[in-house]
Amino acid sequence: MKKFWKTTLAVAMTACMAVSLAACGGGSASSSSDSTAAASQSGAAADGAIKIGGSGPLTGPAAVYGNAVKVAAEMAVEEINAKGGVQFALQFEDDKHDAEEAATAYGTLKDGGMQISLATVTSAPGAAVSPLYQEDQTFAITPSGSSPSVIYADGEGMTGAYGNVFQMCFSDPNQGSGSATYIAAHPDLGSKIAVIYKNDDPYSKGIFDTFKTQAAADGLEIVYEGTFKGDESDFNVQLSDAKAKGADLLFLPIYYTPASQILTQADKMGYKPTFFGVDGMDGILGVEGFDTSLAEGVYLLTPFVANAEDEQTKTFVENYKARANGEVPNQFAADAYDCVYALAQACEAAGVTADMSNADICAAMVEQFTSMTFNGLTGSDMTWNENGEVTKAPKAMLIQNGEYVPAAE
């Protein structure tokens, strides 16, 4: 099993470096006009700071993700600026997990002089604005936009890489295949698998598709596949069908709000399988009105465990909690923190300065990210390929006594 977690998880693609550099060629298309009333500006940087922009859901049902990214990114910017080397100024906008809102946020960030981007927090908005990063020759790295459509023009076929949009998070295909292989290596979790996924969401469907393929390769038995769309909140039919099929493990490649509803409704009907999710379920313990005792024993695949004992994680968690009213950081926060530090490492190595054009900064960032190794909260010896996919090992996390703890490898 340990050998699996050490293998390369990024998909090997054939696009060449020329494509990446082409995405950053020419002059800057970013506006240098002054920004007014930004949703969030942080950094306390000196004059000459490199302007970083980003957007995510700060309001609405996915706000736990966006606010975690915002807090962690602000924290990283302030720490980096205090060191006196490369200086950043951060502007972060609310996109409400909506593609049109994300496009509006992009325009605001561009008008504010954005030179490098943290892209978007969630996948659907990311897929909508990634072509704009390529068009404007602005380098972007998303902490958590995991769909292939965020970094590929053809997300389903995983072709046509933008070349200048990178991911810090696992891609959806890797989450699906990684989950299946972990479950296969731990047969005590369950032998008959049911899946409930959101079939109008590229994130959810993308994970399911690769989970199903890998499950077949690993000899897992999927006895039921249930779907839902939009804002559906009644899952009694799907749960009843899964229970009738004898499923003793329920795989949920979905976000935390519907996951909390599924756990609640399963409990009411006396259905108690092992629940297994991915990064979108990180945050379920913070759902308002949810009985968190129902999440006891839930498994998640994630790159970050807040209860890890290494000093870097402990310091990050302590500082984050001090800024976030005692809230424990999720993996979205950790990925965002890593994004900012990876950008700082790349900027320092490339000698990037604020007076450079977006295109020149973009080319320098692509060159650095495709050649450097980065150590962060969410992985050691991380690397990126020319398509923007990251290579790092996932970890399984278990909810125990109301806390996230490392699960067996």
Regions from the PLM with identified roles:
Residues 1-11:
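Bacterial N-terminal signal peptides that target proteins for export
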Residues 7, 25-29, 34-409:
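Extracytosolic ligand-binding ectodomains
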Residues 10-18:
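Hydrophobic helical h-region of N-terminal Sec-dependent signal peptides
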Residues 19-23:
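C-terminal motif of bacterial Sec signal peptides marking the signal peptidase cleavage site
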